[in-house]
Amino acid sequence: MGDPRCAPLLLLLLLPLLFTPPAGDAAVITGACDKDSQCGGGMCCAVSIWVKSIRICTPMGQVGDSCHPLTRKSHVANGRQERRRAKRRKRKKEVPFWGRRMHHTCPCLPGLACLRTSFNRFICLARK
């Protein structure tokens, strides 16, 4: 190591250590999943923002988090059909959801609702 030509190589090897954040500041990347039941409490299995072909455990929406409304327009129909539709809509919002989520966000935590704040922006807010 006394050779001066080794200094640039040593610096190159140690440089990544200088820019690595301490353990407490690093991002936590949750694991891949197929179903909500594979994720811990307060999480759901949602589409990755970066790679659409995989799903990752994602935290459920807290107050102020952006969300997706996950609602359908209701059509005028007889009572039985409307009850079935309402039941299906409710099931889509539940965690664990037994189907495959097609959006990158989870529903809001219990007690919160996904409410419109502007034309195309929805956030989790306390139910009124």
From Swiss-Prot:
Recorded superkingdom: Eukaryota
Chief location category: secreted
InterPro entries for this protein: Prokineticin, Prokineticin_domain
PANTHER family: PROKINETICIN, PROKINETICIN-2
GO biological process: angiogenesis; chemotaxis; circadian rhythm; coronary vasculature development; endothelial cell proliferation; epicardium-derived cardiac endothelial cell differentiation; epicardium-derived cardiac vascular smooth muscle cell differentiation; negative regulation of apoptotic process
Gene3D superfamilies: Lipase, subunit A (2.10.80.10)
Lineage, opening ranks: Eukaryota, Metazoa, Chordata, Craniata, Vertebrata
Record bears the keyword Disulfide bond: yes
Induction remark: Activated by CLOCK and BMAL1 heterodimers and light; inhibited by period genes (PER1, PER2 and PER3) and cryptochrome genes (CRY1 and CRY2).
Function in brief: May function as an output molecule from the suprachiasmatic nucleus (SCN) that transmits behavioral circadian rhythm. May also function locally within the SCN to synchronize output. Potently contracts gastrointestinal (GI) smooth muscle.
Disulfide bonds: 33-45, 39-57, 44-106, 67-114, 108-124
Subcellular location: Secreted
Pfam families: Prokineticin (PF06607)
Keywords, comma-separated and alphabetical: Biological rhythms, Disulfide bond, Neuropeptide, Secreted, Signal
GO cellular component, as recorded: extracellular region
Tissue/organ expression: Expressed in the SCN and among a few other discrete brain areas, including the islands of Calleja, media l preoptic area of the hypothalamus and the shell of the nucleus accumbens. Highly expressed in testis. In the SCN, expression subjected to high amplitude of circadian oscillation.
Signal sequence residues: 1-26
Gene Ontology molecular-function annotations: G protein-coupled receptor binding
Protein known as: Prokineticin-2
Family as reported in the entry's similarity comment: Belongs to the AVIT (prokineticin) family.
Record keyword Membrane present: no
